[in-house]
Amino acid sequence: MPSRSLPLLFGAALCAAALSGCVIISNVDEDKLPAAWKSEINPPAPRPPQGRFASAGLIARGAKPPVEGRLEWMFLPGQIRDRTPAETIELATAPDGTFTARAWRGGRVVAEVELPGRLDPKTGWLELERIPVKSTNKFGVTVATQSARVAVGSNGALYVQMSSTEAGVVLFLPAFGTGTVWGRWESAKP
């Protein structure tokens, strides 16, 4: 699909979704995070996000307690097609901000992505825009965009603030959704 038609699809889906009632908006602000998470990310550790982290972690989606979440959902959405998740995700950040994420399972790389990033000198967070999303929706056609802020907390855990927008047609109905979630993943033991 040509990139110039993406804004038209988003606009059409948003208008149709608003008329039909298929709109989902969910945002988690920093003030809604668990207290322990807040103390670990303010300020984040001065080192860029790199190293190996467990693929299984926690995602905060609002007032409810955090739920299990996979790190590959943040940087490699839809790229691991089989049902067996990655064991660890290896992250590397180059001095120019280029960010690489590799999903490891059984001693081999099963998915990899390289993204342009920008290190915010004031906060220490790495900002990533336009994370490629491969649709796994079996019930319709959707277009999604995803961006993230990444930092290592004072305890060595990885924190990700991910924002996404998705629009399209699902089960013959126009749909639109947007949201922001936070995730936390422990450093993997070598």
Give the label of every model feature segment.
Residues A16-G21, E30, R105-G107, L115-P116:
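Short intrinsically disordered, low-complexity segments
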